């Protein structure tokens, strides 16, 4: 899995799991709003009054309505170990 994907998945999954409303801005300037129903490597399914399949390559920015905690234990920086001199 690429590093970019390992950042996207926990973030999008937290938004989906907690049903956090989002604003998604497309590269052409259009703003979409709703909740993330599901996603995969290429698309996000956005739910509002209708379901919309949005291709990730068309997305500029995803803005949650509130702060999101999407960090996992594996995301924490490693601590430096003391070396004996």
Swiss-Prot record:
Pfam families in alphabetical order: Hfq
One GO process term, biological-process aspect: regulation of DNA-templated transcription
Domain Sm: 9-68
Gene Ontology MF: a single term: RNA binding
Gene3D superfamilies: 2.30.30.100
Subunit structure: Homohexamer.
Protein name (database record): RNA-binding protein Hfq
Gene: hfq
